[in-house]
C-alpha cells in the first residue's frame, strides 16, 4: 500500500519554492525553532520533514504557492509580491512582509531604443512578460499603448530576436540585462516576499501558527 502524505489535523504544512526564497526562509524558520532536515536541491522528495514533527514543508512552483495555501493544501507559505499581484489574494491572509528575496519589477528595452520618446509619440509597443496582469495595469495607468506577449522563459530574448520592443521582468543587480544589451527604463514596483496564511487555518490552527508567525515577524523586522 502506498504511504499517505495527508497532514494530520494538528500538523502544519508550509509551501515553499526552491531557490532564493527557500534559502532566505531557512533563517526565519530557525528563528521559530524549526529546521528543514533535507535539502530540496539534492532530495527528490517534494514533501520535506523538519525538526518539528508537527511541521512539514512542501516544495512547489513559486507561482503555485498562493493556490496551495488558498485551497488549504498548505496552511501557510512564502510567495513573492510579484506572484501575489498576479494571482490575487482570495482566501489568503498576508500578515508579514518578510523582507527577503528583494528585487524590483521594471521595464527594460534594448540599449539605444528611445523608450521615453516612443511613449510621448503614442507608439504601440510589444512587451514580453510573464506578469501580464501587473504590466497591463501599469501601462494603462500611464496611458501607454501595448500589446502584451506572455512568456515563461527568458524575457531578455524577446527584444533580441524581434519578438518585442520591451520586457517587464524582475531585476536584482541588472547584470543579466547588461549582458544582453538591455537597459532598465522604468521601475514598476519594489518586490519582496510575503508570508501568506490560509484564512481557515488561521482560525482553526491559531495556537500552533501564532508562535511561528511571531518568530517570523521578529526575524524579518531585523532584516528591514
Swiss-Prot record:
Q: What's an example GO BP annotation here?
A: L-histidine biosynthetic process
Q: Sorted alphabetically, which PROSITE patterns does this protein's record hold? A: ATP_P_PHORIBOSYLTR
Primary location: cytoplasm
Query: Which keywords does this chain's UniProt record carry?
Result: Amino-acid biosynthesis, ATP-binding, Cytoplasm, Glycosyltransferase, Histidine biosynthesis, Nucleotide-binding, Transferase
Q: What is its EC number?
A: 2.4.2.17
Please give one Gene Ontology molecular function term for this protein.
Answer: ATP phosphoribosyltransferase activity
Q: Known SUPFAM superfamilies for this protein?
A: Periplasmic binding protein-like II
**What's one Pfam family here?**
HisG
Q: From the UniProt record, list the reaction(s) this protein catalyses.
A: 1-(5-phospho-beta-D-ribosyl)-ATP + diphosphate = 5-phospho-alpha-D-ribose 1-diphosphate + ATP
Compartmental location? Cytoplasm
Q: Which Gene3D superfamilies match?
A: Periplasmic binding protein-like II
What is stated about domains? Lacks the C-terminal regulatory region which is replaced by HisZ.
**Known partners and oligomeric status:** Heteromultimer composed of HisG and HisZ subunits.
Q: Which family would the database say this protein is a member of?
A: Belongs to the ATP phosphoribosyltransferase family. Short subfamily.
Name of this chain's protein: ATP phosphoribosyltransferase
Q: Which gene encodes it?
A: hisG
Amino acid at each position: 500500500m502506498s504511504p499517505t502524505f495527508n497532514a494530520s489535523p494538528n500538523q502544519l504544512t508550509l509551501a515553499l519554492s526552491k531557490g532564493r526564497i527557500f534559502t532566505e526562509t531557512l533563517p526565519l524558520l530557525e528563528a521559530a525553532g524549526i529546521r528543514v532536515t533535507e535539502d530540496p536541491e539534492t532530495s527528490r522528495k517534494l514533501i520535506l520533514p523538519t525538526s518539528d514533527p508537527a511541521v512539514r514543508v512542501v516544495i512547489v512552483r513559486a507561482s503555485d504557492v498562493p493556490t496551495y495555501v488558498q485551497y488549504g493544501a498548505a496552511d501557510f507559505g512564502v510567495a513573492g509580491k510579484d506572484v501575489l499581484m498576479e494571482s490575487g489574494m482570495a482566501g489568503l491572509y498576508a500578515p508579514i512582509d518578510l523582507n527577503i528575496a528583494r528585487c524590483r519589477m521594471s521595464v527594460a528595452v534594448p540599449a539605444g531604443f528611445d523608450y521615453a520618446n516612443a511613449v510621448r509619440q503614442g507608439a504601440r509597443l510589444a512587451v514580453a512578460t510573464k506578469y501580464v496582469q501587473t504590466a497591463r495595469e501599469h501601462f494603462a495607468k500611464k496611458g501607454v499603448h501595448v500589446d502584451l506577449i506572455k512568456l515563461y522563459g527568458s524575457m531578455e530574448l524577446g527584444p533580441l530576436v524581434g519578438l518585442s520592443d520591451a520586457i517587464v521582468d524582475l531585476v536584482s543587480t541588472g547584470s543579466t540585462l547588461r549582458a544582453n544589451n538591455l537597459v532598465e527604463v522604468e521601475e514598476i514596483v519594489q518586490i519582496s516576499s510575503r508570508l501568506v496564511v490560509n484564512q481557515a487555518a488561521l482560525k482553526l490552527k491559531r495556537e500552533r501558527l501564532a508562535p511561528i508567525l511571531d518568530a517570523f515577524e521578529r526575524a524579518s523586522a531585523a532584516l528591514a
